[in-house]
Swiss-Prot record:
One of its GO terms (cellular component) is membrane. This is Transmembrane protein 218. InterPro entries: Tmem218. It is found in: Membrane; Cell projection, Cilium. It comes from the Eukaryota. Interacts with TMEM67. The lineage of its organism: Eukaryota, Metazoa, Chordata, Craniata, Vertebrata. Belongs to the TMEM218 family. May be involved in ciliary biogenesis or function.
Amino acid sequence: MAGTVLGVGAGVFVLALLWVSVLLLCALLFRASGAARFSVIFVFLGALIVTAILLLFPRASDAPAPEAETKIVDAFFIGRYVLLAFLTAVFLGSLFLVLIHHILEPIYAKPLRSY
């Protein structure tokens, strides 16, 4: 399914854009005075006609085209393992430093007498 976004084709987005623009135009024309207020009917009917034309004359066929067998190739194979090795080394170094800091934490002597 080439040319799809979120599983739907471009026609759905064209229809959504058409109806959003028509609704905004109708909202603006409702505030108009005089004869411009009645042009909302023509805008709405025009949108209905364009929608009917777009729905009745689809571009693609009903049967999907046979898909060619895809070969999966991992192009970033070496880089992924270099990154994994680097992150492992950083993790082990950090763990070593934390344990050393924990083991070598200074313990201060308490004074026997306080005057």
